[in-house]
Regions:
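Alpha/beta-hydrolase
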Residues: 1, 10-15, 20-21, 25, ...
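Non-catalytic accessory segments flanking enzyme active sites
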Residues: 13-86, 90, 289-292, 296-311
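Glycine-rich "HGGG/HGxG" loop immediately N-terminal to the catalytic nucleophile
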Residues: 59, 120-122, 135-148, 183, ...
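Short beta-strand element of the alpha/beta-hydrolase
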Residues: 91-99
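The serine-hydrolase catalytic nucleophile loop
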Residues: 100-112
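Conserved hydrolase catalytic core segment
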Residues: 113, 117-120, 164-216
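Alpha/beta-hydrolase active-site loop
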Residues: 147-164
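C-terminal subdomain of alpha/beta-hydrolase-fold enzymes, centered on the catalytic histidine
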Residues: 235-379
């Protein structure tokens, strides 16, 4: 059964969050000057002051509710999703999937251009019917009893599309762990998922790199991860311990998420707001804070580790369905040589962007929209 859903956060809940922010003991935190050691105290405090004085969650709630929101049960988990029916004669079902620390907020500005391109100077016959789920454990979706990872989530997403929404065939797009889920859809659910578009490489071939160029890429990746891997290790091994602190600290959640937005984005002059407004940053953070899902959202890393981590199974052959790839220069980790990519995917399109980072739907929405449209027009 599919039920209509409307977000309606109480003013009391918002007020309680604001009080926690107001009472945060800033004097107990050292100012380390900059972002080298983690989230910048000066900027975080500035953002938090805006949070309690000027940020209006209800404005963002209204935007989300302006789309058609639903909930449905898949494998015992209540899944929240946006579904916007596209224009034209036969709009292709497109599953858009966020990762961590993202949410449905990432996609709010690209839904209309994809579903109603004629309103943006495009062709209505190139429209998609767009489905944007909150992943299990994230936001307004329910959580599993115990952690599971992207491979299981792919199974749930495929059931959402085929059993609950009755689409025999569909296509999928994702970045971050949304790309991981898309990979599993393309490998295990190719009878339904007919093509995927990704903007992040998150999975590895079990045979590893073979050429010198591929080996150099992996060596650079491993070196880069020395200062990047702390959050992932914590969330993949002991997520519960971190959650006790985060569940009662909106400031803590903001700090944890902001660091990644800063590190993984294509900033001008190291200015976070050269790419994102305070409102966009806080709307995404509030999805975690309002729903108390920082804990269960982090479980995806634990589940991923249990599923085998970055590597496909040893019997992996290739994802045979058509794959489109958008490469943004400030992605969290560099893309490997094309020789390695083509061992994993049946690559039909690679677009090398000249700007943008890990969150292209927020950073460079027009680039992502055009690349999605171009790829799925023929795949």
């Amino acid at each position: 059964m599919i039920k209509e859903f409307t977000i309606n956060v109480s003013e009391e809940h918002i007020s309680n969050i604001n009080n926690k922010i107001k009472n945060y003991p800033w004097s107990s935190i050292e100012d380390m000057n900059g972002w080298t050691h983690g989230t910048n105290k000066k900027y975080l405090r500035e953002l938090c002051e805006y949070w309690v004085s000027d940020f209006e969650w209800k404005k963002h709630e209204k935007l989300i509710n302006s789309f058609s929101n639903f909930k449905t049960n898949v494998d015992g988990i209540e899944i929240h999703f946006i579904k916007e029916i596209g224009s034209g004669k036969n709009p292709k079902p497109l599953l858009l999937m966020h990762g961590w620390p993202g949410s449905i907020v990432e996609f709010l500005e690209i839904i209309k251009p994809l579903t109603h391109p004629e309103d943006f100077g495009g062709n209505p016959n190139e429209a998609f019917t767009v489905i944007v789920p909150s992943l299990p454990g994230f936001g307004f979706s329910g959580a599993p009893i115990t952690p599971f990872g992207p491979r299981k989530i792919a199974e749930i997403m495929n059931k959402l599309m085929t059993e609950n929404l009755n689409y025999k065939n569909y296509v999928a797009q994702g970045g971050d762990l949304g790309a991981t889920i898309a990979n599993w859809l393309g490998y295990y659910h190719a009878s339904n998922c007919k093509a995927i578009h990704i903007n992040c490489l998150t999975m590895r071939h079990p045979d590893g790199p073979q050429t010198e160029e591929e080996k150099a890429w992996l060596n650079k990746f491993n070196n880069d991860q020395i200062l990047q891997d702390g959050y992932r290790t914590q969330q993949a091994t002991k997520p519960q311990s971190l959650s006790y602190a985060m569940i009662d600290s909106p400031v803590g959640v903001a700090a944890w998420i902001l660091e990644k937005m800063y590190e993984w984005s294509d900033l001008k002059n190291n200015d976070l707001e050269s790419v994102y407004s305070k409102d966009v940053l806080l709307a995404n953070i509030m999805v975690y804070v309002l729903t108390n899902t920082f804990n269960t959202a982090s479980w995806i890393y634990y589940g991923r580790r249990e599923e085998g981590g970055r590597y496909f199974p040893k019997d992996f052959t290739k994802i045979e369905i058509p794959t489109g790839i958008a490469m943004f220069p400030k992605e969290m980790s560099a893309w490997p040589p094309e020789s390695y990519i083509k061992k994993i995917f049946n690559v039909k399109q690679i677009t090398k962007m000249n700007e943008g980072g890990h969150f292209p739907a927020l950073e460079k929405p027009k680039y992502l929209i055009e690349d999605i449209k171009k790829f799925f027009k023929n795949n």
